[in-house]
Amino acid sequence: IANIYDMAMKMGAPVIGLIDCAGLRLQEATDALEAFGSLYFKQAMASGVIPQITAVFGMCGGGLAVVPGLTDFTFMENKEGKLFVNSPNALEGNIDSKCDTASAEYQSRTAGLVDAAGTEEEILGQIRSLICMLPANFEDDASYEECTDDLNRICADLANAAEDTGIALATISDNNIFFETKKEYAKEMVTGFIRLNGMTVGAVANRSKVYDEEGNAESLGCLLYTSPSPPD
């Protein structure tokens, strides 16, 4: 894996890791720990140079759990994906039925480590969509693609999306495509990528409501203040 990072940085190509691993073997002892350290070092050196994406499809525990934390984007499979440094049952009284801290739901909603969760097919599709929006490396200008959408078109329903800015961002984006990151974490804020006139643009916005596919609204009751503290 460390050699793959060397080649990726030399070529200026993204690294995508698909993880389903039971962890290191105790028989390998310090050799395995040294290998983890080497991988962490390569990831740190690649940070900001090439995109790093991790998808957890099965077990990802112990020292390997640090890897998703060092990558730029992390995805998890809903049912089989498990992400933990210490096994959840290492905590007294912590059972899966009470709080599965290794699950995709917990890691995306509470820990905020996971950008998106879903089935294997959904995750692979999301990775493809994300890769299309990102440059291959920090020197690449390939985050631009030919645009067939009119930048000056009228967004007739934009006012109706004022409360849920995720919808507003999709409305103004080329072909109404918005890739949202950390979708389940801190829903009062929206972050992600859109395209404007073919160019990838990072987006951040606050919102007060979240609308589902059926139009039902979840009120968040949050406001964004520009001053250090809320007014009296």
Describe each region flagged by the PLM.
Residues 8-12, 32-33, 154-163:
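Short low-complexity stretches enriched in small and charged residues
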Residues 1-26, 193-207, 212-216, 227:
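A structural preference for short, pocket-lining loop segments at secondary-structure junctions
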Residues 13-14, 40, 51, 187-191, ...:
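Short glycine-rich loop/turn motifs
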Residues 225-232:
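Conserved small/polar residues in nucleotide/adenosyl-binding loops
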Residues 1-3, 59, 188:
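Short alpha-helical segments and helix-capping/turn motifs at coil-helix boundaries
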